[in-house]
């Protein structure tokens, strides 16, 4: 099953280090254009990008995927919609960083019973808050454009 396979790769370290991936050399062959590929399932990418969630940031990942950021931003916009009328994405980023959104989000989490120490992840939290504001004020395309600018895998592949 896919999730068990992911867990095995996570535990073996092959998501973090290219050399940890086990490739069966007996299933090696060349394509018509001379490229070496391996059989046996799965794809080894041309550009290896280590899995970005280092041990210890699982809580932040879970939090960002929980929908809590979405609800928080919705409530912020519901209370202050006029403040954001006509704002650009760049000005929105400045507003998120200069405003009290990080502390307000921590309070919002605590009220919901979630107690995470986010101080070491403040920049990431602010980034995800900014992205969610962009999604709710603009559209999904603007949201994903913003996320992809900070996506390590996308950036590494584009730099090749």
Language-model segments: residues:
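Conserved functional hotspot residues or short segments at active or partner-binding sites
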Residues: 2-160
């Amino acid at each position: 099953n896919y999730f068990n396979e992911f867990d095995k790769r996570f535990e073996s370290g092959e998501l973090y280090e290219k050399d940890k991936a086990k490739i069966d050399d007996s299933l090696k062959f060349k394509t018509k254009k001379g490229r070496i590929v391996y059989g046996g399932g799965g794809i080894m990418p041309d550009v290896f990008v280590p899995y970005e969630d280092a041990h210890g940031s699982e809580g932040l990942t879970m939090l960002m995927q929980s929908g809590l950021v979405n609800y928080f931003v919705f409530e912020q916009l519901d209370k202050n919609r006029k403040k954001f009328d006509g704002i650009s994405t760049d000005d929105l980023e400045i507003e998120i960083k200069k405003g009290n959104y990080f502390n307000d989000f921590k309070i919002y989490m605590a009220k919901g019973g979630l107690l995470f120490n986010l101080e070491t992840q403040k920049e990431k939290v602010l980034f995800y808050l900014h992205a969610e504001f962009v999604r709710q004020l603009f559209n999904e395309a603007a949201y994903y454009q913003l996320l992809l600018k900070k996506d390590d895998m996308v950036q590494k592949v584009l730099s090749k």
